[in-house]
Amino acid sequence: MEANTIFVQIASYRDPQLIPTLEDMLEHADNPENLVVCVCWQHSADDEPIEIFLDKGFLPTRYYEDEEMGYNIIVMEKDGATFKIIDLDYNDTEGACWARYQIQRQYDGEKYTLQLDSHHRFVPEWDTKVIEMLESLRSEECPKPLLTAYIPSFDPENDPGARVQVPWKMDFDRFIPEGAVFFRPSAIDHWKDLDKPMASRFYSAHFCFADGIFCEEVPHDPEYFFHGEEISIAVRAYTWGYDLFHPHRIIAWHEYTRKGRTKIWDDHTTPEKNAGKVKLDWVERNNLCHKRNRILFGMDGEDPSQIDFGRFGFGTVRTVRQYEEHAGISFEHRGVQQATLDRLDPPNNVEYEDEEEWKASFARSNDVHVCVHKDAIEVVDDFDFFFVGAHDENGEEIHRKDLGKEEIYKYLNSPNGFIDYRMIFLSAKRPASYTVWPHSESRGWMEKLDFPLDY
């Protein structure tokens, strides 16, 4: 293999930005001949025929069948780069993580790997810059650096004018009810003062650069669907000895809006399943994925030993507890430490003597789905507010955030008639129920509605 070969991984689902992304990658690469790009091309022959490649100068050189999986792979060349296109009807895919795993099966010893989505733009000489950045981190104390981030955004309809020119990092957002951790991007405020990448708690599936062997050591679990992908890879990578970092300079941009793209949840629906076009609908796959993620982390009383995760489990270089200490989150308690909320650089280094002190260092991250149809409420024309509160198992109020008049009637007059939103908050205790209690200017308190939370 060439010394600085890069195995580029791109899972693309019916994305009109795929070809522009590949062209921009090639145009701005310093050494395109070092690129081996594998695309899991989940597409419809009607709106994405092979001509979208041929018309842009991609030259097919070989065509063969993956006998184990039953799909075809088209090998192409352009500008010295090699492309392996996994040709897959969009009805045959099993989700983003499954597609990423199919790509990783094509890894062939390249020195580095870069995982992306199919909607990016790149800085000039991006390949040289990202290699230099990674190698600047390598040492005896850090033998396996990994670069990752929710990279800054661009807009294909206003490009390059709308490109954000500040590098981004990843901050904790919340534990969702199903158990996965969500993140949000934010600017690296002091990026101009940095001469190296900054330490990271988390991993992004749309930008990850590491040694090529990462494809084999921490492969995507094909039984994951979407949510849970990034937090599971973050912890698995950390336990395999990888140290996570955010780039301190921009390498590429990502398109976040999904505008103009058909998504898998638009296609893999219950009617399509009933018609025999897909094996499972996206909701079924999503629920199975969430269950698998909770089992992996032993959340909500799940026993991790009920599944043999094999190569999709944790590594042996570090423990999950060491990751939790680094990141300042607790899977068992769905907890987050203040330093993580304050967006301070990791590791948190919180000292504790025993499990009680460890637990006490966290606030519980809650995401309560409030959902009430107007038919459950006696609707009057002079509501002034709704009490909305969460309670623990003893009925004690642990959070309250009322709805005002404008919000109330916006929901009640909506086409579906649902009061439907998420109540996100921190607390010391676990919420067991929530209450919606309407108040009228003329009638005072009306019927109180209580809803248990099912974990």
Question: What are these model-predicted stretches?
Answer:
Residues D159-G161, F182-D195, A199-F209, R261-Y455:
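Terminal low-complexity segments of carbohydrate-biosynthetic enzymes
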Residues E2-G310:
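Catalytic cores of eukaryotic secretory-pathway lumenal/extracellular enzymes that build
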